[in-house]
Amino acid sequence: MVRRLSFTAAGVVIVIILVIAFVGLFMLRRPGTLEGTPTTIHLETVAAVGAANEWPRPDDPHPDWVGYLPTTILRVPANSTINMQIDQEDGATGLRNPFWGKVFGTEGGNMHMTYFDDKGNPQEGDMTSIDPTQAAHTFAIPDLGVFVPLLGVNSNAPAGSTNVITFSFKTKGPGIYHWQCFVPCAAKTVFGNGGPMQTLGYMAGELIVS
């Protein structure tokens, strides 16, 4: 009888050990995290692509068109963090819809900017919006919910000044995502929305996620 009880007790102990091992190895063990690859993209926005500071295109068929440089076709990895730097050299045009003066879809819900105040003094800080009347351009990817207004260079800033805007956003799965500027900045076109606003390589582009 004693031997039978001993075997029973030993069996119970073994079962308890197996249950604890199962819980420890499977139930409480979290799967690993797959981190996306950070990617940095550096762009320049200019009033005329033929006279840019960083990536001028003097032989461009439309040298007086506004544009993003050096290109508007951007290739990035899927499910990753994209770090953006945009060197904004153009003056203000203004947004027709003040709602788009706000930042959307970025990491932290803001952007960091170095710029010049009304006295021409350099300033720096994190922002969640700008005065919509002072926007020069925007960087917007509607299908990703990303929208960043780009402040125009203050008229009192030193000649050749640049506002530097940095922010980050996350990509989704593979695909081609259209991006564009929403400021009607195309001079000499109908309502400012023709020409470069509708043309790849200027104020419209593709984000190729793969």
Residues of each region from the PLM?
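Extracellular/periplasmic metallocenter environments
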Residues: 11, 20-29, 109-126, 130-210
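Extracytoplasmic entry segments of secretory-pathway proteins
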Residues: 1-129
